[in-house]
């Protein structure tokens, strides 16, 4: 049976964690990104399909290539962030299912239905983006997920060779607490939940 995390750990992952828009001038080591991925990959996905693919934009040259695809509101914070992760998905993720889900012929579920494949890839890569955020927080990093970018441009610039499709971006680094907005409210349990 799983143990309940300490209040401090829960605060790190949830109640004290924030979405950052400003970043300290402090690099993120590649080894830490690898560690975050190794944690995030363990989160559940449908039939262990693991459709997410991650491109970590770290160099100034790569950031310049990303720049034209960003919306104006996301430009400054993304260029300042030490790392921007493109969370993408592989449309033919199901080709890995004989390895990832050997107990069943799960590949055929998706080759017979392109609509199901696309829906599954998008939903589960979104889940995996959330796992990456939690993994980064657990490792002392801050994040800033966002949708304000031109998907087609990102796909053409960074993903075309592999055929992946972008879902969202996540800025990663060490957040500048002086650039935080006041925390916005969240919906109460009774506003967002039902127990039937």
From Swiss-Prot:
Cofactor(s) the protein requires to work: FMN
Coiled-coil positions: none
Enzyme class: oxidoreductase
Claim: NAD is one of the keywords in the record: yes
Catalytic reaction equation(s): 3-hydroxypropanoate + NADP(+) = 3-oxopropanoate + NADPH + H(+)
Keyword Oxidoreductase among record annotations: yes
Protein name, per record: Probable malonic semialdehyde reductase RutE
Organism: Yersinia enterocolitica serotype O:8 / biotype 1B (strain NCTC 13174 / 8081)
Upper classification of the organism: Bacteria, Pseudomonadati, Pseudomonadota, Gammaproteobacteria, Enterobacterales
